Amino acid sequence: MNVFKNFEKKIKKSLELSDIKGKNGEDLNLSKITVDPPRDSSHGHLSTNAAMVLAKSIGLNPHALAEKIIELLKNDSSIDCIDIAAPGFINIKLTKSFWQDAIKSMLKKGTSYGRIPMGQGKRINVEYVSANPTGPMHVGHCRGAVFGDVLSNLLQFVGYNITKEYYINDAGKQIEVLAHSVLLRYREALGQKINEIPEGLYPGEYLIPLGQSLAQEFSDQLLTIDKDEALSIVKERAIYAMMSMIRKDLAALNIYHDIFFSERMLYADNARAIRNTINDLTLNGYIYKGELPPPKGQNTEDWEPREQTLFRSTDVGDDQDRVLVKSDGSYTYFAADVAYFRDKFNRHFDEMIYILGADHAGYVKRLEAMAKAISGNSAKLSVFLCQLVKLFRNGHPVRMSKRAGSFVTLRDVVEEVGRDPVRFMMLYRKCEAPLDFDFAKVTEQSKDNPIFYVQYASARCHSVFRQAQEIFRIENVSNDTMIAHLNRLTDDNEIFLIRKLSEYPRIIEQAVVHKEPHRLAFYLYDLASSFHAHWNKGSDNFDLRFIQPDDKELSFARLGLIQAIMNILSSGLAIVGIEAATEMR
């Protein structure tokens, strides 16, 4: 039950059935009416902007219209009181029996509460991580990995059919560099002295075991056979080894993709997928032969002062046309990207989501252009850019140097602080905002550490049930037993917690609509904080404690409140990819 949506519908229905019309007698446009929690909880339980958004079209001032709307709602038995806040917002306070019924509904739905049927089975492809297979995942990949995974879980929760996809960039120059870097480590494993890693090769020590493995498998054969053949063998082994490493890194974060799509597949059969893509674009008038001026202040790697095969991407919103085939007949990276999008489009997804690093900001327009050209403007495309993660230790920056091969890996972070803190904290800022990750803060046992505070709330809830079992000498308390006594929940603090719980479906809906899973993390912390605040009041006032040894019925009612909190913490944390704690260790 979404309390806010239900009251929005009530208000709209009341207006539709009323004699309130526009200035010229026309029906009202009710689409901008919303019902939300008031900014100040002391102002009521619900607040609507109905009078504010309709006043001008009706020809009344907002306050006068608010009075008319209040008149329409005055006979609603669920409303305790209703008033107007300047200049025309309507604040509503609901009855305690309404909130008792609300928590009854929550308990009946269990962990399915908040599971709004928004997706209706529509198919969405979410591509995330897609790190180059040239080494272990570093902490910079971590944020996009968590964002993509939680967004996928969130969309799945409300009924979308999700495909989690990883694009393996295994056909570009970086693979050549990787192969030469591994060959160097191979020669080192054979006993050759390697003084310094040449500029441009990967210097990380993570390649040493691969060099040793090749030496064990091939002895010195790779130095005696044809160089191209040796390089081909090393490439295959290196890509396999790097992707195995990356899969293990992702598994450490509890991330598992459905599909790993190899870029090399696009080049199979004489690059048939790319050729077919260019043919399709040609038929639709997007391909021509020509020259491009050198890009100002940008990478000129794909620029040549010669005739090339160009994609007329400016026709579909790009800043400049893009090279697909160079003058020597070789394909650009972008040609493979367009072919990859075409492959996705031909798999008939209703929407395609790309999650990229902030350094890909300049890539968004060409992505959108290729989507319009390939799909005839029918594809729904969403692109998200995840900003950088800055590492700190006790407030001091952690220095990293990719050139020196010294960077903090994803596995390093997970092994030091644990999977759950990493997942939660990577989500604890909007993805477009930079994120500071302090190793000390995320392991701190205080309210300033969001994941600790949320898990502590879950553990405390479980402890209340254990206390009830001990005091009342019962093995468990059934849902029906708790529901039967919910009318005993009358304290304002209890009603406040029920109101906080009732926001969950609204938070889920907003997080899905805006594709902002950080809203869920914020809500879970907010709910945990409200719970802890009530718990602390019980330390000062025995009557507010959840278990009342001399009043079993009140205790059962409060256990119902605890169960509802547990259900939502468990549900929300599951979407984040975290198991709710039953006790703190």
UniProtKB/Swiss-Prot annotation:
Keywords: Aminoacyl-tRNA synthetase, ATP-binding, Cytoplasm, Ligase, Nucleotide-binding, Protein biosynthesis. It is an enzyme of class 6 (ligase). One of its GO terms (cellular component) is cytoplasm. CDD domains: ArgRS_core (cd00671). Its main location: cytoplasm. Its EC number is 6.1.1.19. Coiled coil: none annotated. It comes from the Bacteria. InterPro entries: aa-tRNA-synth_I_CS (IPR001412), Arg-tRNA-ligase (IPR001278), Arg-tRNA-synth_N (IPR005148), Arg-tRNA-synth_N_sf (IPR036695), ArgRS_core (IPR035684), DALR_anticod-bd (IPR008909), Rossmann-like_a/b/a_fold (IPR014729), tRNAsynth_Ia_anticodon-bd (IPR009080). A motif ('HIGH' region) lies at residues 131-141. Monomer. Belongs to the class-I aminoacyl-tRNA synthetase family. PANTHER family: ARGININE--TRNA LIGASE, CYTOPLASMIC, ARGINYL-TRNA SYNTHETASE. This is Arginine--tRNA ligase. It comes from Bartonella quintana (strain Toulouse). The lineage of its organism: Bacteria, Pseudomonadati, Pseudomonadota, Alphaproteobacteria, Hyphomicrobiales.
